[in-house]
Every structure is written in structure tokens, then in C-alpha cells.
């Protein structure tokens, strides 16, 4: 009986320690809680012309001025970093599925969080805030649909 009681106490203590020490620092929820910003949850289009994050009508994704990605043709593409031409005024943020503004950064939400940073107000740098793994860019942003 004492062994069973001791085992039960150890099990409960272990569960308490595990739940208290759990690190969720990489979760979307924590990222959004850390940022003060403006939220929008509207349409699925970001940007204008040839520079955009996601256009639901064509499924073209993340078209960069440096030519790393020209369009999305259904194949997995591991690239996540690049530059998007344009300035803040060129992008209609009211049409972004989910976003937050913080300084010169835009955090785009959806399936996973992406961080977009303005550089000299004429380029956008896309920064991956999660580990890439083997996910395609399409898999990472299709949560906008």
C-alpha cells in the first residue's frame, strides 16, 4: 500500500513539474500576446501588383524582387527569406488575413506566424519566425484560406 501511495505521489509531482516547466515560447499564441498591434481579419490578399505575400485567386505566394521565388506552382519550396519590393503605402493592410503592426514590422498570422520587416521604407524583408523544417511555403500560409 505504501508503495502504491508513494508511486501515486511521485506521478502527481512529476505531472506538476512537467506542466509548470513547459515552454511554449514558440507558439503562435505567445507571439501574438507579446505584440501590441493592430489586428485585422478580412480578405486574403496582401499587396499590389507583382509583390505580394498571398493571392488567394491565383495561389501565387511570396513573390520576391530578388527572384528567389517567382510564383507557386504546387511544388514544395524551402525558401522563406527574401525581399519584397514596395513601401508601406504600397500594401493595403486592410486586406491582410491577420496581421499586427509593431514599429516597422508586420507580423502576418494564419497557419504560422511570419515576420515582415521594412528596410529603408522601400523593401520588405520576410523573416521566418518558426523553424522551417520541410514545410513548403504554401503549407505555411494556407491558413489564410
Explain the meaning of each model-derived region:
Residues 41, 69-74, 106-109, 122-128:
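Short hydrophobic/aromatic-rich beta-strand segments that constitute the beta-sheet cores
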Residues 5, 13-38, 42, 143-145:
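Bacterial Sec-dependent N-terminal signal peptides
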Residues 4-8, 12, 19-21, 48, ...:
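Residue-level recognition of alpha-helix boundary/capping or hinge positions
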Residues 113-117, 121-134:
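Short, exposed beta-strand-loop hairpins at the edges of beta-sheets
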Residues 51-107:
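N-terminal glycine/threonine-rich, aromatic-flanked beta-hairpin/loop signature
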Residues 96-99, 113-117, 138:
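Short, surface-exposed loop motifs enriched in S/T, G, D/E and P with embedded aromatic residues
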Residues 81-96, 127-145:
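Edge beta-strand at a domain terminus
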Amino acid at each position: 500500500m505504501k508503495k502504491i501511495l508513494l508511486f501515486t505521489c511521485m506521478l502527481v509531482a512529476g505531472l506538476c513539474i512537467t506542466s509548470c516547466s513547459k515552454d511554449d515560447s514558440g507558439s503562435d499564441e505567445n507571439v501574438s500576446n507579446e505584440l501590441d498591434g493592430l489586428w485585422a481579419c478580412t480578405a486574403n490578399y496582401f499587396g499590389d501588383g507583382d509583390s505580394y505575400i498571398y493571392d488567394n485567386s491565383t495561389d501565387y505566394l511570396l513573390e520576391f524582387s530578388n527572384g528567389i521565388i517567382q510564383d507557386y506552382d504546387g511544388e514544395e519550396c524551402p525558401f522563406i527569406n527574401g525581399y519584397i519590393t514596395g513601401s508601406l503605402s504600397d500594401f493595403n493592410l486592410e486586406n491582410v488575413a491577420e496581421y499586427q503592426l509593431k514599429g516597422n514590422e508586420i507580423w502576418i498570422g494564419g497557419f504560422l506566424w511570419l515576420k515582415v520587416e521594412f528596410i529603408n521604407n522601400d523593401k520588405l524583408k520576410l523573416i521566418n519566425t518558426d523553424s522551417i523544417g520541410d514545410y513548403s511555403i504554401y503549407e505555411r500560409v494556407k491558413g489564410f484560406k
